[in-house]
Amino acid sequence: MIDRYKHQQLRIGLVSPQQISAWATKIIPNGEIVGEVTKPYTFHYKTNKPEKDGLFCERIFGPIKSGICACGNYRVIGDEKEDPKFCEQCGVEFVDSRIRRYQMGYIKLTCPVTHVWYLKRLPSYIANLLDKPLKELEGLVYCDFSFARPITKKPTFLRLRGSFEYEIQSWKYSIPLFFTTQGFDIFRNREISTGAGAIREQLADLDLRIIIENSLVEWKQLGEEGPTGNEWEDRKIVRRKDFLVRRMELAKHFIRTNIEPEWMVLCLLPVLPPELRPIIQIEGGKLMSSDINELYRRVIYRNNTLTDLLTTSRSTPGELVMCQEKLVQEAVDTLLDNGIRGQPMRDGHNKVYKSFSDVIEGKEGRFRETLLGKRVDYSGRSVIVVGPSLSLHRCGLPREIAIELFQTFVIRGLIRQHLASNIGVAKSQIREKKPIVWEILQEVMQGHPVLLNRAPTLHRLGIQSFQPILVEGRTICLHPLVCKGFNADFDGDQMAVHVPLSLEAQAEARLLMFSHMNLLSPAIGDPISVPTQDMLIGLYVLTSGTRRGICANRYNPCNRKNYQNERIYETNYKYTKEPFFCNSYDAIGAYRQKKINLDSPLWLRWQLDQRVIASREVPIEVHYESFGNYHEIYAHYLIVRSVKKENFCIYIRTTVGHISFYREIEEAIQGFSQACSYDT
């Protein structure tokens, strides 16, 4: 079991053959060492029991039933008086069957095999470290090419013949075909190397510190050279410099993590615990097996065949040995990553086998589905809709979701207030949805934030905390300003809601994760809570109006609307008398009484500085009254003057939408100013 306080992180990397052997081997009480899987069998077809030394062997991986060996004998687990601790007939230990979830085995490969992730995945780590083309290394791994061994003191047979013009070339044109298996082994050990063994030799001979020094020197030399004038050559230099940087970073990573490069070539192949690749019996007596079992069987079959060729058959041609090594390499490649070399392997029903990579990667892989994205308690999920009346730090939680998330808190409240005698009575009151339940739920939610998360959580603002309030319906209401942080919109997106339980989690949600405290982007510092989409359209409709300027009102009658205070002139067009209001409250009151529309033009008395008015602007019209006062009408404002040309008041031409928008901004500024004054 992993202790969460001692282990804060999990790292996946390469391990040595010695470490694989330490994981998989164990010494049973009679002194026998077990752990190697040598047979490609699973269960016996008659007894329906695991085969010895097979993929489900109970000696290697532990008993199927706790305390029961393969013979059927039973021992009490943990009883020190009972002896022995294992069955002398079958060699199975009397332990808990849960050991089959973590006890590993191993396959001892007759020939080394490269790990396909480090060879075929881009960038190829093996090609980067060896500074050789990937195509040549692939030919070397799959026995299409051979590698000449560097023997300094003795001249090699092939070099004397002139068979090797290059370090790596096709073995068909360099190796004599008359060698038998016995002679071929001696010849190959002296003259050439092919397959993954050649890669392992080259990786083992590397000095990572020298690689870093040489790469740095070459990078500096390329940097000192100026442009050649040839575009193609300049591009080659840039690509070479980028490659040298990647090579140095890779070598530094190997040094920093104490990983040897030759570990990218496998000599021991780990076998997963049986419970992670089960065989299940379904209706009708049929068996369903994990695809990995079949892929392991192919590896064992081909590995055993290669062992027989090298040990029992003394007259096997060298070509056949190389072909069998290639088959072992391909079988391991299919086990680790099916389809990485081209066409994936399929079963009899033309279905692609799921390899180890398919099991762990992707949305339905072991990590994202079981470890990272598993279901948790005190969480829910629903569609989000806009909540126009919500504050920035609030969210609307449906009653159905809220009562489920806070049910334990409501039960505790009912019992504390002596409204329920026990948990059963409290649950029945919740099922009956009594009014007191909603009152207690409101009290609980007032001091308890919730976390909203929208997948995928690509940055810190993908999960934020809110103060929940109860809403009707079955959807989560959200303030539209927080959508940009979540990268959400209201076209059917779903969000998950979580309840922080511990005091530490609640404090973190309040101090660090509240939406009104995350107004800036953590990446670039720009405002993240900005109006988008629906809000921009709403602001446009709110402030656009139907007419622009007094001229359109008087001389463009085609765009008019009918209002309650309209009169018809003899010219057969309708003229709308625009109402006057002393303050914004009267204008909004008239709108609520449906006397004017949201975009109806009106005159609003305003405290405007005379210096703002352009002195050169000429009024469009001047209306005189009987007492000598007159009105100067401009495009967007109106001035009432006396006979002595003194300003009585100023009216601006606006709409109810503009007034509402201005009042919201004014209230926000006043609230911000008050908050700043409290802080100081």
From Swiss-Prot:
Quote the catalytic activity from the record: RNA(n) + a ribonucleoside 5'-triphosphate = RNA(n+1) + diphosphate
Q: Where in the cell is it found?
A: Plastid, Chloroplast
Q: What Gene3D superfamilies would the database entry show?
A: 1.10.40.90, 2.40.40.20, RNA polymerase II, clamp domain, RNA polymerase Rpb1, domain 3
Where does the chain bind Zn(2+)? Answer: C69, C71, C87, C90
Give binding positions for Mg(2+): D489, D491, D493
Cofactor note text: Binds 1 Mg(2+) ion per subunit. Binds 1 Zn(2+) ion per subunit.
Q: One GO MF term, please?
A: mRNA binding
What is the protein's major site of localization?
A: plastid
Record-level GO cellular component terms: chloroplast; chloroplast nucleoid; DNA-directed RNA polymerase complex; mitochondrion
Q: Could you say which EC number(s) this protein's record lists?
A: 2.7.7.6
Q: Which cofactor does it need?
A: Mg(2+); Zn(2+)
Uppermost EC category: transferase
This protein's superkingdom? Eukaryota
Q: How does it assemble?
A: In plastids the minimal PEP RNA polymerase catalytic core is composed of four subunits: alpha, beta, beta', and beta''. When a (nuclear-encoded) sigma factor is associated with the core the holoenzyme is formed, which can initiate transcription.
Q: What does the UniProt function comment say about this protein?
A: DNA-dependent RNA polymerase catalyzes the transcription of DNA into RNA using the four ribonucleoside triphosphates as substrates.
Q: Which family does it belong to?
A: Belongs to the RNA polymerase beta' chain family. RpoC1 subfamily.
Q: What is this protein called?
A: DNA-directed RNA polymerase subunit beta'
Q: What is the lineage of its organism?
A: Eukaryota, Viridiplantae, Streptophyta, Embryophyta, Tracheophyta
Gene expressing this chain: rpoC1
